[in-house]
Design a protein with these regions (language model features):
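Extracellular/periplasmic carbohydrate-active domains that bind, remodel
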Residues: 1-134
Length: 134
């Protein structure tokens, strides 16, 4: 059972978890890879895992942090002032087991503007991701 990008409290009471193969409950956020620094306050960021597409990643006012992939170093702590989905057309998913079954359009990328000037090293060239802390 995975919970991703949730806010508030998650309670599991008297649950029976069998045949899960790994963690019975996995609570986590979803990173977006920085693929382009558009200007000092704006980036283009992308889901890199096919099972993550389609999640609402963030909202205006959310607080984020940047993470250098190679070292897990944390950089910056700005808040989102604008977020725009970059929607792609897909071949409609035919597999009824897929969470995207029947979906023909999905947001894989976002243009995200922040309330602060970004650290200079945050770009599409330095291997950074953005994590929503809210």
């Amino acid at each position: 059972t995975h919970f991703s990008g949730c806010k508030g409290k998650i309670r599991s009471v008297n649950g029976l978890y069998e045949g899960m193969m790994d963690d019975a409950i996995n609570v986590h956020g979803t990173y977006l890879k920085i693929v382009e620094r558009i200007d000092d306050c704006t980036v283009r960021a992308r889901y890199m895992h096919g099972q993550a597409w389609g999640f609402d990643w963030g909202y205006i006012g959310d607080r984020v942090q940047f993470v250098r992939s190679r070292t897990m170093e944390l950089v910056g702590n700005p808040f989102v002032t604008e977020i725009k989905e970059v929607v792609e057309c897909l071949d409609e998913h035919k597999d009824s087991a897929s969470p995207l079954y029947g979906v023909s359009h999905v947001a894989k990328e976002f243009i995200i503007r922040f309330g602060d000037v970004l650290p200079p090293e945050v770009s599409g060239y330095e291997g950074y991701v953005v994590e929503n802390l809210t």
